């Protein structure tokens, strides 16, 4: 009886390896296709699941999906209100492997304006060029990554819930509010910001570097995480409870 159980376990392990190999080969050797989706009139982007989205601000609307054919077919793009919604239709096979650059799926998006980025899950949002808008809301819930090179706006709201990362390499804004709940990380580089409010609840980290013409920063820390401030501001205040730290060793305050 025990011998039969061992044999059955061995067969199941071999089948699992074979299934994984088949799915892996499907992603690696499958034909790469490019598909254009006809969607217009959006000013927000919502990503649900694991897609990677590359955004560029432009005069026109465009949505292009590129990757292995079965994965392209697995991506749904649709308009809901003011938002372009990008999501996975479902898993491909039992294991969804992507090996190497040739096996990766990417959704390329352009629009004249962008006022909201919402990422729910483990996907990625990447913008390598300037986004020029009046107000932008950037929200991440999950383990994904949002990486924005350059933003110029009047107001910027940043919210992270979970273990993901938000990196804003350059933000030129009058008003910025950033909130982190969980174990994730927010990294900000600010220019010309009159009011900055940073709130952390949990074990994550917020890093903010203040460059030219930044005025006031308010920090609220609840938990074991850290807020690390660098650069120069005119006013600084903090509220703290828990074992975390608000580091100001590299912050200069000059009223």
Locate predicted features.
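Acidic (Asp/Glu) and glycine-rich low-complexity loops/linkers
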Residues: 2-8, 22-120, 124-139, 150-159, ...
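Sec-dependent N-terminal signal peptides
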Residues: 7-15
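C-terminal motif of bacterial Sec signal peptides marking the signal peptidase cleavage site
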Residues: 17-21
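Short beta-strands and strand-coil junctions in structured, solvent-facing domains, enriched
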Residues: 53, 93, 125-126, 145-146, ...
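Poly-acidic low-complexity segments
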Residues: 70-71, 118, 147, 167, ...
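Short, surface-exposed interaction patches in beta-rich subdomains
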Residues: 166-255
């Amino acid at each position: 009886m025990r011998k039969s159980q061992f044999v059955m376990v061995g067969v199941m392990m071999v089948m699992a390896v074979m299934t994984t190999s088949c799915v892996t080969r499907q992603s690696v050797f499958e034909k790469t296709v490019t598909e254009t989706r006809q969607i217009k009139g959006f000013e927000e982007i919502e990503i649900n699941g694991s897609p990677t989205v590359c955004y560029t601000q432009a005069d026109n609307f465009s949505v292009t999906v590129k990757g292995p054919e079965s994965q392209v077919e697995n991506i749904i793009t649709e308009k809901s209100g003011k938002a372009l919604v990008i999501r996975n239709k479902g898993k491909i096979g039992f294991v969804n492997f992507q090996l190497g650059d040739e096996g990766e799926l990417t959704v390329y998006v352009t629009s004249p304006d962008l006022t909201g980025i919402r990422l729910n899950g483990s996907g990625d949002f990447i913008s390598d060029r300037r986004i020029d808008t009046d107000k932008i809301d950037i929200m991440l819930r999950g383990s994904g990554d949002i990486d924005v090179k350059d933003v110029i706006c009047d107001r910027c709201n940043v919210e992270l819930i979970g273990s993901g990362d938000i990196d804003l390499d350059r933000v030129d804004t009058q008003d910025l509010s950033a909130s982190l709940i969980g174990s994730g990380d927010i990294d900000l580089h600010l220019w010309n910001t009159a009011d900055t409010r940073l709130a952390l609840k949990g074990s994550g980290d917020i890093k903010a570097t203040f460059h030219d013409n930044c005025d006031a920063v308010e920090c609220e820390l609840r938990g074991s995480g850290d807020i690390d401030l660098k650069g120069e501001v005119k006013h600084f205040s903090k509220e703290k409870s828990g074992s975390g730290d608000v580091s100001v060793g590299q912050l200069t305050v000059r009223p």
